[in-house]
């Protein structure tokens, strides 16, 4: 297992690699991550849609959703929320703020396209027909729950969510084997879903799928509009994710492990030999 200091140093190299990807590769890998999270979203809703006890339904959905993060970490993709940790490389002056923001933008675009792609295919494929169209109602309810949040609530839930998501990514870097990555990343992701915190990329899927399902199945949901989804929900959730991931986890761990202990490729060569950075992609 890698120590927290090794994880921090490793992520500097990972951050350098990420920001130097071409725009095409960044968007393409972002598309894959968006799809993976979208698959987790529909699976989570399907698993919990017919369970009458709300807390049990929430637990079942939370138990299923981490499959999306597992695919992101192991299959190779770029997830906006996890990439908030690039701030470590910025604070170490190995990456410019501009390059980090550019990466975030194109990954975010790719994530949206991937999540929306899954949402469209779910509706076109009539997946919401399951369980006598109970799944259709559950999909719309999931989207409406997000658009019913106040801007402040959405922002705070976004902060809480990405603290856990970035901790999941951080913990996965401690593992040297795939099994370890899956096990360590599972619990923080399960917790954020169970607690009802908001993940911007997951909400891209939930929002688009909810809007399309409501239209296709004639389900009325007054608060479920494109404006409410994009501006009232997704925007503050995204900003909250940045605060939680880059501000709290990224800056916090930089202060704990790297501040006044600058990264040096020469002094940590032996440590870096043990870390297979390529497996993160």
What kind of region is each of these model predictions?
Residues 1-281:
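Alpha-helical transmembrane segments and their helix-helix packing motifs
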């Amino acid at each position: 297992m890698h120590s927290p200091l090794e994880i921090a140093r490793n992520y500097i190299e990972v951050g350098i690699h990420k920001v130097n990807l071409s725009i095409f590769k960044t968007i393409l890998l972002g598309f894959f991550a968006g799809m993976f999270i979208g698959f987790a979203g529909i699976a989570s809703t399907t698993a919990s849609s017919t369970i009458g006890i709300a807390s049990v339904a929430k637990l079942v959905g939370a138990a299923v959703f981490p499959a999306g993060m597992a695919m992101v970490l192991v299959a190779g993709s770029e997830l906006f929320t996890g990439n908030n940790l690039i701030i470590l490389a910025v604070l170490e002056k190995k990456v410019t703020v501009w390059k980090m923001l550019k990466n975030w933008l194109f990954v975010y675009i790719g994530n949206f396209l991937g999540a929306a792609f899954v949402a469209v295919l779910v509706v076109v494929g009539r997946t919401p027909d399951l369980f006598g169209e109970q799944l259709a109602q559950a999909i719309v309810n999931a989207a409406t729950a997000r658009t019913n949040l106040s801007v402040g609530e959405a922002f705070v839930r976004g902060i809480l969510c990405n603290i856990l998501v970035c901790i999941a990514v951080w913990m996965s870097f401690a593992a040297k084997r795939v099994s370890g990555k899956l096990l360590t990343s599972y619990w923080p992701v399960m917790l954020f879903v169970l607690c009802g915190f908001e993940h911007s990329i997951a909400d891209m899927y939930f929002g688009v799928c909810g809007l399309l399902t409501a239209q296709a199945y004639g389900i009325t949901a007054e608060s479920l509009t494109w404006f409410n989804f994009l501006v009232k929900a997704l925007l503050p959730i995204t900003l909250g994710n940045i605060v939680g991931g880059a501000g709290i986890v990224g800056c916090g761990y930089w202060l704990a492990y790297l501040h006044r202990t600058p990264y040096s490729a020469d002094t940590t060569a032996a440590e870096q030999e043990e870390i297979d950075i390529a497996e993160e992609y």
